[in-house]
């Protein structure tokens, strides 16, 4: 069987075949054999073989010169004159198709990533490798594993399938199908995927995340679940290196702290490092209460930390505690076409500021509030909350309260420099005005028939309410006024100066605050 033998050969031998030639370049020894009418070249020791631009190496290689194929053993190495190198303990190579079967301790490197498996089928001509019995790709500190995978050498993409995991120092990704590029480090999600980073869990079905730049784009209603918040939107763009995010299309932000608020919009931009939220395109802030929810909408809603405010808000409460709870270190601002709706209170204004530390909502520029049938206006209105329910209203400058009397065109009215309204269990309990106080009150008899109009002035006027209806009026200091029969007064004297009944601007439901009415 042994035709010839040579040691430390460096002679080139060319196989006789109609296909692309396999060239024997060097080996420590070789044998030529003929078995069943097939010719074999047995090469041993630092074997080097060439086919076109493809080089093959091994401890020993048997070349079937008849079929233009070979079998390699020990430290097998294939390189196609590029940066992709494959290694294995065992190789079967078809020189006609340039397809290789690598087995045992298989390794593929492309200069950036290293793929290891126990079985790899590799097409040298198109640089595609396939494994089906488990594989691992390592790129720096990033490790990817799956049961099946396909490596594309031209694009440097790897398609992982079946029990896929990607682990790096910052993220752990679990999915069924994942595409990863060893050069750009871009991971593409094409099946339901979970991305875990500390306490944060991202769920997506479609999108991508760059392990190197920490930037990602997620689609098809992806979500982010963290210890303090939950985000969901049709589309997301995130930058973990800067802590930034943009959420588009039916975006919802839900807080998980004791404040329990939700923010909805078609566009929300977030800065996690500075705790900033900017919502546009029909934004709605929902402040949850035990039995009621307050809805606030505007052209723009903004949230940030109180400690980052450059301007200081004037104190409203007589005693304000130091900011100890970090969850209270937050404020909301609303700009332009502000609307408020809850079961007990409704309102509109041009701008709003809500500081969580003092639980006060400040309404500016033509604010109007409605408490059942009572309309309240002033230059500025402060709404003091207790457990997120209205506890008190402070109406500053040009304060006026108006309520319709039944379904008539008559209105009870109260006017002064300022008005304070106290609530008990969400209902009006008392209203008091100070400074140039003036009121018009339509008195009725026991049968609810009008008996006259009381037009009075005093330094202080206090009105007590029961079930939102006035039951008692007290005038303090410098009282002047009189009761006049209704039919004796012209209509012009039935209304105080600057009277404006603005019921058409009142939001009637949580859906109504999204309508353009009142703009």
Task: List PLM regions with ranges.
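N-terminal amphipathic/hydrophobic interface segments
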Residues: 7-519
């Amino acid at each position: 069987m042994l035709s010839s033998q040579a040691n430390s050969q460096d002679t080139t031998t060319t196989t006789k075949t109609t296909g692309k030639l396999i060239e024997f370049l060097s080996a420590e020894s070789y044998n030529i054999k003929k078995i069943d009418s097939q010719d074999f070249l047995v090469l041993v020791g630092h074997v080097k073989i060439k086919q076109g631009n493809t080089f093959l190496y091994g401890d020993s290689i048997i070349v079937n010169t008849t079929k233009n194929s070979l079998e390699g053993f020990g430290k097998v190495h294939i390189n196609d004159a590029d940066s992709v190198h494959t290694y294995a303990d065992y190789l079967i190579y078809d020189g006609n198709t340039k397809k290789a079967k690598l087995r045992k301790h298989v390794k593929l490197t492309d200069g950036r990533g290293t793929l290891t498996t126990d079985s790899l089928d590799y097409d040298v001509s198109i640089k595609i490798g396939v494994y089906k019995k488990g594989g691992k790709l390592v790129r720096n500190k990033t490790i990817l594993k799956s049961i099946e995978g396909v490596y594309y050498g031209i694009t440097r993409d790897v398609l992982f399938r079946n029990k896929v995991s990607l682990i790096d120092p910052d993220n752990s990704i679990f999915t069924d199908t994942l595409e990863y590029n060893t050069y750009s480090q871009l991971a593409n999600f094409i099946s339901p995927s979970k991305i875990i980073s500390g306490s944060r869990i991202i769920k997506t079905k479609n999108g991508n995340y760059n392990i190197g730049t920490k930037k990602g784009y997620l689609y098809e209603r992806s979500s982010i679940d963290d210890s303090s918040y939950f985000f969901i939107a049709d589309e997301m763009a995130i930058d973990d290196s800067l802590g930034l995010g943009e959420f588009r299309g039916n975006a919802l932000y839900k807080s998980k702290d004791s404040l329990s608020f939700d923010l909805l919009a078609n566009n929300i931009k977030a800065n996690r490092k500075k705790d900033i939220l900017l919502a546009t395109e029909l934004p709605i802030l929902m402040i949850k209460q035990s039995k009621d929810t307050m809805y606030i909408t505007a052209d723009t809603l903004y949230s940030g930390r109180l400690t980052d405010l450059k301007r200081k808000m004037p104190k409203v409460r007589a005693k304000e505690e130091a900011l100890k709870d970090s969850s209270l270190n937050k404020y909301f601002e609303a700009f332009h076409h502000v609307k408020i709706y809850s079961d007990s209170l409704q309102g509109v204004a041009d701008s709003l500021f809500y500081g969580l530390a003092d639980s006060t909502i400040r309404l500016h520029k033509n604010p109007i509030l409605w408490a059942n049938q009572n309309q309240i206006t002033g230059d500025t209105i402060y709404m003091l909350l207790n457990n997120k329910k209205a506890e008190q209203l402070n109406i500053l400058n040009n304060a006026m309260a108006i309520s319709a009397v039944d379904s008539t065109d008559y209105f009870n009215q109260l006017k002064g420099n300022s008005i304070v309204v106290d609530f008990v269990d969400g209902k009006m309990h008392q209203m008091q005005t100070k400074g140039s106080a003036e009121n018009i009150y339509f008195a009725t008899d026991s049968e609810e028939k009008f008996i006259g109009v009381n037009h009075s002035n005093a330094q202080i006027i206090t009105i007590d309410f029961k079930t939102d209806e006035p039951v008692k009026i007290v005038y303090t200091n410098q009282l002047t006024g009189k009761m006049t029969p209704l039919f004796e007064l012209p209509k012009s004297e039935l209304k105080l100066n600057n009277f404006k009944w603005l019921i058409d601007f009142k939001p009637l439901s949580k859906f109504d605050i999204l309508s353009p009415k009142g703009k």
